[in-house]
Regions:
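C-terminal regulatory/oligomerization modules of transcriptional regulators
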Residues: 89, 94-140
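Recognition helix of helix-turn-helix/homeodomain-like DNA-binding domains
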Residues: 27-43, 51
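DNA major-groove recognition helix of helix-turn-helix/homeodomain DNA-binding modules
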Residues: 47-65
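Short alpha-helical "recognition helix" segments of helix-turn-helix
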Residues: 20-23, 52
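Short, charged recognition helix plus adjacent turn
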Residues: 64-97
Length: 140
């Protein structure tokens, strides 16, 4: 299940509204809402999301979660043509292996992607220069 389908369903359940009622409130077919919840349809348009937020009077946090989930649920995306060719090769490998990735592998990949942010947050350690001794003859 996509993040949007899950978030949409969880919000509807939290507000205690049946699909049929929500369809009437929003002016959509109940079958369309069902298709969204069971992930047969990709995330809906921003207009749909705004209407859902408005009709249920969602909080800012819920609205933010819904938009984040919609973005995460996009099934197609386009690579910027200016990217380094290694990115294209990496994405080809990712597409081929996505169905077989374990949760551990997915979490590791996400950690690696966040590594730059983590490194930026750590303070830079200053290295003290080594003091050299003056040239002296060794005692024997």
């Amino acid at each position: 299940m996509s993040p949007f389908a899950d978030t949409f369903y969880q919000i509807r359940m939290r507000y205690g509204i049946r699909q049929k009622e929500l369809a009437q409130i929003m002016g959509f077919e109940q079958t369309y809402l069902s298709a969204i919840e069971v992930d047969k349809k990709g995330p809906p348009s921003n207009e749909f999301i705004h209407r859902f937020i408005q009709k249920l009077q969602l909080t800012e946090l819920e609205a933010s979660q819904l938009f984040d989930a919609a973005e995460a649920s996009q099934r197609k995306f386009t690579l910027n043509k200016e990217l380094h060719q290694d990115v294209f090769w990496m994405m080809r490998d990712m597409r081929a292996r996505l169905p077989e990735l374990s949760t551990v592998q997915i979490n590791l990949i996400r950690e690696i992607l966040n590594l730059k942010d983590t490194l930026a947050q750590k303070p830079i350690e200053t290295i003290r220069p080594i003091k050299r001794r003056r040239n002296q003859e060794a005692k024997m």
